[in-house]
């Protein structure tokens, strides 16, 4: 397990395809209500910055700019403004993005090269990927040290603890199969980060539910999906509910970057697809057709 909440039964909310608006669009609010969803923004990297105490990585969040553009700008010393990185240096931004998401899962140069080549539509050499990873860890040296320290601890002990003290046993680190042992180590490191994000989300949901009950708002949280909280809220209470949820999620529980609480993204709509169904599909008579992409 990764330390996140799990879901099972006839309605397994966590197995709803994330990018399928047909299925998500079936979850609709009744008249007079809205579905409100809140996601933690770039949660895994935010909490990696917290746990590693890497000031350079924390500075990326306090800067307030696009995360991946800021990372690329810092790592590759790009001669442009951060806001222009996405347009002028898309390959470098894709590289920074692939490394950021990959390091917590133990991705090496080969995986980074494949990811960037596919995303940017260019040939991205293995040697370049390794150079970029080296440059990344030169800039974020404390993150590198934290990853190394956690790896050594897990390999030596066969367990790890979440930020709030839950023990995750990892017996397969002692496997004679190096592939299994390596996967177990990666799972342990990833669990430390994901469990913290999940716990913060859960504490925020509990505090919000209690405050909603106290204030007698017509709102009910009906599912938590990884880093998101989804609720059914009466139209008259949507604005207040959103403020309460954001405030409770961003409370400092001892795991926040100073002066920069975790970011949140909120969506409000008639259904769980939040209008994406209408952007992707059209109904002509009884026939459902996909709208051609303009990209």
Predicted regions and their residues:
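Acidic, glycine-rich two-metal-ion catalytic cores of nucleic acid-processing enzymes
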Residues: 1-87, 149-228, 243-251, 282-291
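Catalytic palm active-site di-aspartate
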Residues: 39-40, 109-111, 115, 132, ...
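Catalytic palm subdomain of template-directed nucleic-acid polymerases
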Residues: 48, 104, 110-124, 229-246
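Short, amphipathic alpha-helical "recognition" segments used to contact nucleic acids or chromatin
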Residues: 95-104
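Extended, well-ordered alpha-helical scaffold/bundle regions in very large, multi-domain proteins
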Residues: 105-150
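Short, conserved secondary-structure transition motifs
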Residues: 138-142, 261-277
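Flexible helix-coil linker/hinge segments at domain or subdomain boundaries
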Residues: 251-265
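Acidic, low-complexity intrinsically disordered tails
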Residues: 270-295
């Amino acid at each position: 397990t990764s330390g996140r909440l799990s879901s099972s039964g006839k309605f397994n909310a966590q197995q709803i395809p994330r990018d399928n608006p047909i299925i998500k669009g079936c979850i609709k609010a009744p008249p007079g209500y809205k579905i409100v969803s809140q996601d933690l923004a770039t949660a895994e990297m935010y909490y990696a910055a917290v746990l590693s105490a890497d000031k350079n990585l924390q500075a990326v969040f306090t800067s307030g700019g696009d995360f991946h553009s800021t990372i690329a700008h810092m790592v590759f010393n790009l001669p442009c403004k951060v806001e222009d990185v996405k347009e002028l240096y898309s390959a470098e931004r894709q590289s920074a993005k692939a490394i950021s998401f990959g390091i917590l899962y133990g991705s090496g140069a080969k995986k980074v090269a494949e990811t960037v080549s596919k995303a940017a539509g260019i040939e991205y050499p293995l040697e370049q990927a390794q150079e970029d990873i080296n440059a990344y860890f030169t800039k974020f040296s404390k993150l590198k040290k934290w990853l190394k320290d956690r790896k050594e601890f897990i390999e030596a002990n066969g367990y790890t603890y979440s930020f709030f003290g839950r023990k995750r046993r990892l017996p397969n680190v002692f496997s004679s199969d190096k592939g299994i042992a390596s996967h177990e180590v990666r799972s342990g490191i990833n669990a430390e980060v994901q469990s913290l994000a999940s716990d913060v989300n859960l504490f925020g949901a509990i505090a919000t539910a209690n405050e909603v009950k106290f204030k007698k708002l017509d709102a009910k949280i009906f599912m938590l999906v990884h880093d998101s909280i989804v609720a059914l809220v009466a139209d008259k209470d949507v604005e207040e509910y959103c403020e309460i949820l954001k405030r409770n999620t961003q409370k400092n529980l001892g795991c926040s970057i100073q002066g920069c609480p975790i970011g949140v993204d909120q969506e409000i709509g008639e259904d769980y697809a939040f209008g994406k169904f209408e952007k992707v599909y059209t109904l002509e008579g009884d026939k459902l057709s996909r709208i051609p992409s303009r990209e």
